[in-house]
Amino acid sequence: MKYKNDIIAAIIVIAVLGIIGFGYLRATDNEKVSDSIKFSQEYTNVSKDNPFVYKTDKEIIEILKHGTGVVYLGFPECPWCQGYVGYIEEIAKKTNVSKVYYLNVLEIRKNNTKEYQEIVSILNDYLDYDEEGKKRVYVPLVIAVKDGKIIDCDSETSKDTKGYETPEEYWKNEDLDGLKVKLEKMFSETGKNVCTTDCNK
């Protein structure tokens, strides 16, 4: 009788652990899916299975200083960002870049936070000056980084839209193939998304 009770107790414990484990795996998977879905809701030119992963300003700084991968800085209220992210997704998938680290810079830039200033300092050589003569993150901006070294950046439509009213009009008349070639080279040179710290989680 005691043996039978022990077996029943063991089965119950295993079942409970299985349910907890399944719930954890499902929650983890939902977190990944939610980044993609959330991004596709904010940026309507990407698919629901896009590679964009939300990161904090501190996590982006860590990636830029020590990591490897592709970083995208922008915000959904920017129509030029909306027009750009579809090309980032296309090239990321083509080059097997599974994650594009995303930071919405609107508020930190507006408030000139300490973290924003650090991002500006890291990207200093790749940024343009604003009207006051200070370096500024203009968006959209995509950055390829490997082992904490900036490989290259692209911000083609972030400051000079050459008089075009919309991103669609711009890319219809400008060198879209050239952009794709540049992004493909940048993304390929990152190799793969591997950080030397926890920044790729």
What are these regions (language model features)?
Residues N50-T68:
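A short beta-strand-turn-helix
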